Amino acid sequence: MVGEDPCAPSAPHDFVNSFTHPLGRATESVLRCGHHSKLKGVLGEGNVAHTAMSGNGTTADDDPLQTAVWRLRSRACWVDAAALIEPDTPQASLQRTALLVERCLYTEQGWEEAEDALRTAEAQARTDDERGAAACERGQLAYAATLLHVRDRADEARAALGRAAALIAPGAPGRALLDFRRGVLAENLARSPQAARAAYRRAHAGATAHDDLLLQSFTWRHLAGLALRDGELAEARHGFAESLRIREELGYLVGTAPALVALADTESEPEASRLREEAGRLFRLLGGVPTWLSRQLAPPPAATA
């Protein structure tokens, strides 16, 4: 699935210049989050993707609400995006929950709001797919709390994702996202790279089958991370480059800086430093989000005599 690297950048990547389409009037009327004043006039997109779930599926229809939600989400404005969604149906409640859960993972804030939204989604779920999707979000919220050392909820995460696996049929649209999340749990909590790789490959196949480009950007990146750990530099570079390419094409701003940093880890100087500088610039434009990226962007300690 990964091999030679036809996508590795040979010329400077300019993440600002890659967003060339101006913001539409309808979008400017709803983009009022704290980051928007910094980004207006710098970044924009035309027909961008939107997703109903966290990392689960992208489409490019003309639904103004979903386009606005996507644009806010991509700029790290999850609260503003969630405020546009009335939780009056199971699907709407699940989408709102997914946004607030993603906010927790990227900002280390908003845990109570995400939990409240999740309880609403769980109460409204009627079908196996809806109950499975809610369980998947519970697993993700518990995983994020554990990973970020808010509270150890590893057992809850495993149980919730296991419950989701019993409810979401193989081949269903939500199964690829579930497989991916089981992969990150295996990699980062269980410390089982073999199980993680198998889960990521299932997720990648499912994301490809359902034309889920955003999820593919995550599976490419995590498979590349495992390849880098194994010393497979060319394979890792290819995967990281694919992840970055997809995120730039979709306009997924909040995920672009991490993708730049990951690719930098496979490059030699001066390219590695240039990629990290671009990542730092975007990180600052987004108000220091994702918070955990600050540790990777920090300059190395000065050498002492």
Where are the regions a protein language model picked out?
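C-terminal non-catalytic interaction modules
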Residues: 31-69, 73, 77, 249-305
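Short coil/turn linkers that connect adjacent helices within long alpha-helical scaffolds
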Residues: 88-90, 125, 166-172, 205-213, ...
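TPR/Sel1-like alpha-solenoid repeat signature
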Residues: 178-186, 199, 216-227, 239, ...
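Tetratricopeptide repeat
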Residues: 81, 114-117, 121, 157-164, ...
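Residue register of alpha-helical TPR repeats
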Residues: 63, 91, 95-98, 133, ...
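Short coil/turn connectors between adjacent alpha-helices in alpha-solenoid helical repeat scaffolds
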Residues: 70-74, 100-116, 142-158, 186-196, ...
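"A position-specific structural signal for the A-helix of alpha-solenoid helical repeats
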Residues: 67, 95, 99-102, 137, ...
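Residue signature of alpha-solenoid helical repeat architecture, marking inter-repeat boundaries
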Residues: 59, 94, 129, 134-136, ...
